């Protein structure tokens, strides 16, 4: 894959169930308040370590607030060598309305 794919929350949930890595690019306070279980917070401070330790061929799902910033982050990650990258349309807000029981705090 040379570009990322935009997907709905339902497809992101299916990928998550299959072992995809989920990263959340919202600010730290929003992530602490509520996020997708097992997702990792990714920001300018953690991205270098994340890339260095990642399996570049494992599916990677990127989520933000509403599905806009995640597209830029997904494109960047494709440029860093990730081969199977997805951006969640509607972001965390759409995820939360689709799967209200599939959120975590802390």
Curated annotation (Swiss-Prot):
Annotated keywords: Cytoplasm, Transferase
Cited Pfam families: Rhodanese (PF00581)
UniProt-recorded Gene Ontology molecular function terms: thiosulfate-cyanide sulfurtransferase activity
Highest taxon of the lineage: Bacteria
Gene3D superfamilies hit by this protein: Rhodanese-like domain (3.40.250.10)
SUPFAM superfamilies, alphabetized: Rhodanese/Cell cycle control phosphatase (SSF52821)
Cellular component terms (Gene Ontology): cytoplasm
InterPro entries for this protein: GlpE_sulfurtransferase (IPR050229), Rhodanese-like_dom (IPR001763), Rhodanese-like_dom_sf (IPR036873), Thiosulf_sulfurTrfase (IPR023695)
Record has Coiled coil as a keyword: no
GO biological process: glycerol metabolic process
PANTHER family according to UniProt: FAD-DEPENDENT OXIDOREDUCTASE, THIOSULFATE SULFURTRANSFERASE GLPE
Protein role: Transferase that catalyzes the transfer of sulfur from thiosulfate to thiophilic acceptors such as cyanide or dithiols. May function in a CysM-independent thiosulfate assimilation pathway by catalyzing the conversion of thiosulfate to sulfite, which can then be used for L-cysteine biosynthesis.
Sequence similarity: Belongs to the GlpE family.
Protein name from the UniProt record: Thiosulfate sulfurtransferase GlpE
Gene that encodes it: glpE
């Amino acid at each position: 894959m040379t570009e990322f794919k935009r997907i709905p929350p339902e497809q992101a949930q299916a990928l998550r169930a299959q072992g995809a890595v989920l990263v959340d690019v919202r600010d730290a306070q929003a992530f602490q308040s509520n996020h997708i279980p097992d997702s990792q917070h990714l920001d300018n401070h953690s991205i270098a370590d994340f890339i260095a330790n990642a399996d570049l061929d494992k599916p990677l799902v990127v989520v933000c607030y509403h599905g806009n910033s995640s597209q830029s982050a997904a494109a960047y990650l494709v440029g860093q060598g990730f081969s199977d990258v997805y951006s969640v349309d509607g972001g965390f807000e759409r995820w939360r309305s689709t799967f209200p029981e599939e959120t975590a705090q802390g």
